[in-house]
Amino acid sequence: MSIPYSTSIAQVLDKHLRIRHNGTWEYVEDVRIKNGGTWEDVKEVYIRHSGSWQLVHEGEHFLFNHTLNGNSQSEFSLASWISGQGYSGNKIKGALTVNNLQQRVNLGSWSSDSRVYLRINNNDRISGKGGNGGQRGQNAASNGQNGQRALYTRVGFHLDNGGIIAGGGGGGAGGRNGQVTQQVTETNNCMKGNQCQNTYNVTNNTNGGGGGGGAGYPGGSNGGNGAQNGQSNGGGQGGSSGAGSARNGGNGGGLGQNGSNAENNQGGTRGTAGNAIDGWSYRISGEGSGNGDRRGNSVN
């Protein structure tokens, strides 16, 4: 059988034997030998070159080529998809193409000789969900929620990023409630038909603003009281407070950015941005469009 992906990807993923067929060199998926009258699959093929044996073909790996189409707000798990294809081993080699707006991708954990070619097409994206904005409060305005990471991997991968890989933005902090004191003057009838003025202070409670939702897919929800939801490309604005000592809510963070604290840091705490990639040390190479547009940290 032929391999399920292009020749150029096969060259990157490596360890595919080629044969000459009808005048053309072609990569093959399986190599078989006849042993005792029976054809058997070969696990590995070595050749002797310059006095050393070199591995040129890996025959145990599950080969795949899968494209994500149609926007999805559910995490894509490569392990779950491969299991659905009927493979239960731990050796894989293949290509995954993101052709949509995808909330999170998990490449999983596989054998040390497994490899994935990850392509994000132009104008497409892997994005974490944005963090929700915090709610206003008197003594304990709530914190903004953290944004989600975009890509997780514990398998070696080649990155061809023509789109965006972005952690979700952190939610803005909720602003504290407060009070406002106003001077009130009243005119009343007093002795002998005269009018007298009385002046006194009135104190009323005022509401703080909610935190804005962080950017992501989907964007984070607002924390109420005038705050805005996060969108796929930007964080929501924090809500405005009433007068006096109440404080505005913090803005939601953009893609890969932390949210903002409440006005004068009086309220909850901002949410932090999700990582763009958790598993950066597993990156083998940048191919095609290379590392591309990554918003948020690349860690581990």
Model region roles, listed by residue range:
Residues 66-76, 97-110:
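N-terminal extracellular ligand-recognition/capping segment immediately after the signal peptide
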Residues 91-93:
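Exposed extracellular interaction/assembly regions and N-terminal maturation sites
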Residues 1, 5-7, 49-51, 113, ...:
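Intrinsically disordered, low-complexity segments enriched in Ser/Pro/Gly/Ala and basic residues
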Residues 110-121:
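Beta-solenoid repeat scaffold
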Residues 95-100, 121-282, 289-300:
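Glycine-centric low-complexity/flexibility signal
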